[in-house]
C-alpha cells in the first residue's frame, strides 16, 4: 500500500517551478504543481531549496527565447551549488529539444507542451529512486498545498483559468500552432471546477485565458454561456476576459459587459496592426475602421472600460505609410494600454520566408516612433485620471504601504497605484484616488 504524507515520518522530495512568459504559462505551471503534489513532492520556498527545479519556458518571440536561455543557464549555476535535478519544460523544450540534449547536458530532463498535468508521472518514471512512495494525499491537505509556495506568482488574490489550448488562426508571424497544436477547448465543467477551487483558496479575481478566447466552442453563444456560468460562482468578485481576437465574435461578446457587472471594465484585444495590407500579409482580418468601431462600442457599453492592445512593427513588406497608420490610430482612438513588439522571424512560420524582411535597426526605429506617439497620448490619459476615484484591489503589501490595482488594469502586465496606507490586506477591495503619475504607474490615496 502506498503511504500517506500524514502517516509517515519520511521527508519527501521538494520542487520549485520557475515560470516564464504569459499568464497561459502560469496556468500550465499550476497544472504541473498539482501533478507533482499528487506524486508525493512538496513545494519548496525557492529553486535553491528544491530537489527538482522545473523551468516552464517561453519562445514566442526572440526576446522571450533569450530570456529562456539565460534562465536555464542561471538555473544550471544554481544546480551546481545545490545538486538538484533541473527539468526544462514547455514551448522552448518543444521547439529545441534536440539542442537542449546536445548542448546542455546539465539539464536532467526536458519535455514539451501538452504534458503539464502529467509532470509528476514523468518525473517519477525518469527518477524512480528520487521519489518516496507517497501518493495518497488527504484531500484537505492537497488543497492547502495547492495554494502554497513552490511556484512563482501563485499566492496572489487572482488566478488564471485556461479555457483552451492551441490555435487555428495561422497568423504568419506566430509559432504557437507549431508548439501547442490545433485549438482544443477545455471542458466547461473543468473550467468551472478550476474556478471554484481558486475561489475557495482565496482568489477574488479570475482571469480567463487562452491563445484565442473568442474561438471557444467555435460558437460565441457557447463562450457566453461559459462566461455566465463562471461569473455565477459564489465568492467570485471580478471576472476578467483576456486575449479577445478582434473580430465579429468579440463584438458580440461585448454584450456580456453590459449584462454581467462582475466582468472587469477591461478589453484586451491584440490588433497587431491596423494597415489592411499588412494584416492580410499576416493572415489576419480587420482594418482601421472596424477596430475603431469595436473599441468605441466597448466604451459605449462600459464608459469606465479601458483598452489594452498590441502591435507588431516591422513585419515583412511593412512601409512607413503602414507605420504612420498605427500612429494615427493610437492618437485617434487612444487605447489606454499599448504593447509594442519588434517583429522577429520565427523558424517554421511563413513570415520568416517572406520577401521584404527589414533590418533590426529599422524595426527598432519604427517601434520607437510608435512608442513616442503612445507615450504622448498616455500622458494625457494619466492627467485625466488625476483626482478620480477608482475601485481597486490590493495586490501586494509593502512595509511602507501597498501596491493596489484598479479594476481597469490586469494583474502583472498593466499599471499599478502605489499608496502609503498601512494595515491593508492582500486581496482587500476598496477605492483609490489617483494623485500623480510616473511614465506608466501611478501614486494615490486609499479612500475606502
Swiss-Prot record:
Top-rank taxon: Bacteria
Residues holding [4Fe-4S] cluster 1: 22, 58, 91
Domain Radical SAM core as annotated: residue spans: 153-382
Cellular component GO terms, alphabetical: cytosol
Note on how the cofactor is bound: Binds 2 [4Fe-4S] clusters. One cluster is coordinated with 3 cysteines and an exchangeable S-adenosyl-L-methionine.
Cofactor(s) essential for the protein: [4Fe-4S] cluster
Enzyme class: transferase
Transmembrane segments annotated in the record for this chain: none
Pfam families documented for this protein: Radical_SAM, TRAM_2, UPF0004
Gene Ontology molecular function: 4 iron, 4 sulfur cluster binding; aspartic acid methylthiotransferase activity; metal ion binding; protein methylthiotransferase activity
A single BP term in Gene Ontology: tRNA modification
Subcellular location: Cytoplasm
Keywords tagged on the record: 4Fe-4S, Cytoplasm, Iron, Iron-sulfur, Metal-binding, S-adenosyl-L-methionine, Transferase
Record-annotated MTTase N-terminal domain positions: 13-128
Domain named TRAM: residues: 383-448
Catalytic activity of the protein: L-aspartate(89)-[ribosomal protein uS12]-hydrogen + (sulfur carrier)-SH + AH2 + 2 S-adenosyl-L-methionine = 3-methylsulfanyl-L-aspartate(89)-[ribosomal protein uS12]-hydrogen + (sulfur carrier)-H + 5'-deoxyadenosine + L-methionine + A + S-adenosyl-L-homocysteine + 2 H(+)
Listed EC numbers: 2.8.4.4
PROSITE patterns named in the record: MTTASE_N, RADICAL_SAM
Residues holding [4Fe-4S] cluster 2: 167, 171, 174
InterPro entries associated with the record: Elp3/MiaA/NifB-like_rSAM (IPR006638), Methylthiotransferase (IPR005839), Methylthiotransferase_N (IPR013848), Methylthiotransferase_N_sf (IPR038135), NA-bd_OB-fold (IPR012340), Ribosomal_uS12_MeSTrfase_RimO (IPR005840), rSAM (IPR007197), rSAM_horseshoe (IPR023404)
Function comment: Catalyzes the methylthiolation of an aspartic acid residue of ribosomal protein uS12.
Family: Belongs to the methylthiotransferase family. RimO subfamily.
Protein name: Ribosomal protein uS12 methylthiotransferase RimO
Native source organism of the sequence: Leptospira biflexa serovar Patoc (strain Patoc 1 / ATCC 23582 / Paris)
Gene: rimO
Amino acid at each position: 500500500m502506498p503511504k500517506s504524507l500524514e502517516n509517515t515520518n519520511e521527508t519527501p522530495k521538494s520542487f520549485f517551478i520557475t515560470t516564464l512568459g504569459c499568464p497561459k504559462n502560469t496556468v500550465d505551471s499550476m497544472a504541473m504543481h498539482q501533478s507533482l503534489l499528487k506524486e508525493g513532492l512538496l513545494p519548496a520556498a525557492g529553486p535553491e531549496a528544491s530537489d527538482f527545479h522545473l523551468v516552464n519556458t517561453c519562445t514566442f518571440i526572440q526576446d522571450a527565447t533569450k530570456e529562456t536561455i539565460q534562465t536555464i543557464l542561471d538555473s544550471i549555476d544554481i544546480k551546481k551549488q545545490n545538486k538538484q535535478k533541473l527539468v526544462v519544460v514547455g514551448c522552448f523544450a518543444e521547439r529545441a529539444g534536440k539542442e537542449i540534449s546536445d548542448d546542455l547536458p546539465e539539464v536532467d530532463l526536458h519535455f514539451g507542451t501538452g504534458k503539464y498535468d502529467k509532470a509528476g508521472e514523468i518525473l517519477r518514471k525518469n527518477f524512480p529512486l528520487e521519489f518516496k512512495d507517497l501518493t495518497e494525499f488527504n484531500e484537505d491537505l492537497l488543497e492547502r498545498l495547492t495554494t502554497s509556495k513552490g511556484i512563482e506568482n501563485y499566492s496572489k488574490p487572482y488566478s488564471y483559468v485556461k479555457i483552451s489550448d492551441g490555435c487555428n488562426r495561422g497568423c504568419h508571424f506566430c509559432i504557437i500552432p507549431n508548439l501547442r497544436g490545433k485549438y482544443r477547448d477545455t471542458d466547461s465543467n473543468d473550467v468551472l471546477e478550476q474556478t471554484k477551487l481558486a475561489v475557495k483558496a482565496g482568489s477574488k479575481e479570475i482571469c480567463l485565458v487562452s491563445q484565442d478566447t473568442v474561438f471557444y466552442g467555435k460558437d460565441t453563444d457557447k463562450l457566453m454561456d461559459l462566461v455566465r456560468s463562471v461569473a455565477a460562482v459564489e465568492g467570485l468578485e471580478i471576472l476578467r476576459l483576456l486575449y479577445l481576437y478582434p473580430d465579429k465574435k468579440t463584438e458580440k461578446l461585448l454584450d456580456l459587459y453590459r449584462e454581467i457587472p462582475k466582468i472587469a471594465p477591461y478589453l484586451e484585444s491584440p490588433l497587431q496592426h491596423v494597415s489592411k495590407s499588412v494584416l492580410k500579409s499576416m493572415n489576419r482580418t480587420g482594418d482601421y475602421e472596424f477596430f475603431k468601431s469595436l473599441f468605441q462600442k466597448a466604451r459605449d457599453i462600459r464608459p469606465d472600460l479601458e483598452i489594452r492592445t498590441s502591435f507588431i512593427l516591422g513585419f515583412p513588406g511593412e512601409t512607413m505609410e503602414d507605420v504612420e497608420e498605427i500612429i494615427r490610430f493610437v492618437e485617434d482612438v487612444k487605447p489606454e494600454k499599448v504593447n509594442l513588439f519588434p517583429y522577429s522571424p520565427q523558424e517554421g512560420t511563413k513570415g520568416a520566408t517572406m520577401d521584404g524582411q527589414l533590418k533590426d535597426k529599422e524595426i527598432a526605429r519604427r517601434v520607437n516612433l510608435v512608442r513616442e506617439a503612445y507615450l504622448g497620448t498616455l500622458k494625457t490619459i494619466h492627467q485625466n485620471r488625476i483626482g478620480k476615484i477608482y475601485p481597486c484591489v490590493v495586490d501586494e503589501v509593502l512595509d511602507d504601504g501597498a501596491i493596489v490595482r484598479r479594476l481597469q488594469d490586469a494583474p502583472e502586465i498593466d499599471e499599478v497605484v502605489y499608496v502609503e496606507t498601512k494595515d491593508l490586506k492582500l486581496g482587500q477591495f476598496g477605492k483609490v484616488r489617483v494623485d500623480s503619475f510616473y511614465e506608466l504607474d501611478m501614486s494615490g490615496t486609499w479612500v475606502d
